C-alpha cells in the first residue's frame, strides 16, 4: 500500500499525515476525499472560483484544488499545519487558514465539506454555512459511509436544509443539499458543564472533547494534583476546556499556567474558563501540535 502518493484528477500529490510516524500505514486522505475530487473534476467550479474547504484533515483537498482561491476552515491546528506542509511539498498554493472560532464570510462558489463525527460541531458548522448559501448546489459534502447515520441527516434538516446521500463508492458517500431552510439561525454553541462539585464554572465550545461531562482521565488527574510539589510553571497539554490547569491555578495561585491543545475551540474554551475562574491569572494559550514551536522557559510540571 502506497501511503504517500495520491493519483487525483487534479494531478499526482505526495501527502503525509501528521504527526509523522516511522513506517506509516495510514494515508493522508481517504475514499471520501477521492470521491469529492472525482465529483469536482466532473463538475468543475469556474476558473477563479472561491472555495471554502471545511475539515480538510491533512490538506489533500487544498493541495488538489490549489488553482482556485481556497479558504481552509478547521478546528484543528494540526490539520492546518499539515495542509501548509503538504502544499509546500507539492509546490501548490496554500489556502488561507480560518479557525473554527471565526465565521467564514463573503461569497463562495463552492463549499466543500467533510462531515465531522461530532454532532454538536456538525450543527455549529452547518448553521454558519447556511448563512453563506445562495442555492443548494453550492454545497457538496462527503464522509465515509460508516459515519453517516439518521442522526447526522437530522442535523442537516434542522440546521441547513434537506439533504440526501449518494450511492456508496469505496465505502464513501457524497451529501447533496436538496433545499435550504428559510431563516436558518446561528445558535450559541457553548454548553455549561455542571462542575459545582469542583467549585468552578466551565463552558465548552461545540467541538471540545467530552464537553457534556467530566471524563474519567480528568477525574484521575485531579486526584493526583495533591501529590505534586508546588510548581513554578505548569503546562496543561491537551487542555480541552482547561479544567486541570484551572484547578492547579486554584491550588497554586502563584504558578504560571500554559494551556496547549490542537483544537481552536478547546483553547477558546480554556481562555474563557480561566478568565471566569482565575481572573488575573498569569496564563498563556497555544493552539498547536502538542508543544511544537514552543520556545519559552521549560516547565517543571506537565499534566496531560
Task: Identify the meaning behind each predicted range.
Residues 100-105, 290-294:
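Short loop/turn elements that flank and shape the SAM/SAH-binding pocket of Class I
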